[in-house]
A protein has these predicted regions:
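Basic, polar low-complexity surface loops/patches
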Residues: 1-191
């Protein structure tokens, strides 16, 4: 039971929360939206982040032996909430129920069916009106810079001589997301 649930009680975790933790552990850099009936729910730290970001009421999921923070959004309003979260820079893992509840033998099976990030959107309802670039930066003999709009397939790439030219291009294209080469991720002066 990870600390991410921020729960209290002697345990054990109820099966629903065990399933949540198993999926959440596979996508540690994402906010997991976990379908429970007509809602996408978050638990623990994710619930606190969701409630804070969207101004939602933070409640608690309580079972006989365990209590954890909980917040959720109605599935019917998913596009509007997802758009807001993506604009704030969140990466979303969407876990849907993949079998009807009435046909489930025990716990309803859930699987992550979508991974959404600001730069990889293809859903028409979530796309911004302007280009939605995913940028990638690498170093070598200068600065390698590539832009991809996955919704249209547009691709641009260039090699730049200076860091200021790199920043100028980033400012001009305003990417929704930037991927850094490993050596740049560890360079605090760059990030």
């Amino acid at each position: 039971m990870g600390n991410m649930l921020k729960g209290e009680g002697p345990g054990p975790l109820p099966p629903l929360l065990q399933q949540y933790v198993e999926l959440r552990d596979r996508y540690p850099d994402y906010l997991l939206l976990f379908q429970v009936g007509d809602f996408y729910e978050c638990f623990g730290e994710d619930a606190e982040r969701l409630a804070r970001a969207l101004g939602l009421v933070l409640t608690h999921k309580t079972s006989k032996d365990f209590t954890t923070p909980m917040a959720g959004i109605p599935i019917r309003a998913f596009d509007a909430y997802a758009e807001r979260l993506l604009k704030m820079g969140f990466r979303l893992a969407v876990a849907d129920q993949v079998e009807p509840a009435e046909e489930a033998e025990g716990l309803v099976r859930r699987e992550v069916t979508q991974l959404l990030t600001p730069g990889t959107l293809t859903q028409e309802a979530l796309l911004p009106r302007e280009a939605n670039y995913l940028a990638a930066i690498a170093t070598g003999d200068g600065w390698g810079l590539a832009f991809l709009d996955v919704s249209t397939g547009e691709f641009k790439g260039t090699l730049l001589k200076s860091k200021s030219a790199l920043y100028d291009e980033l400012f001009r294209h305003r990417p929704a997301e930037v991927l850094l080469a490993p050596e740049l991720r560890e360079n605090e002066a760059f990030v």
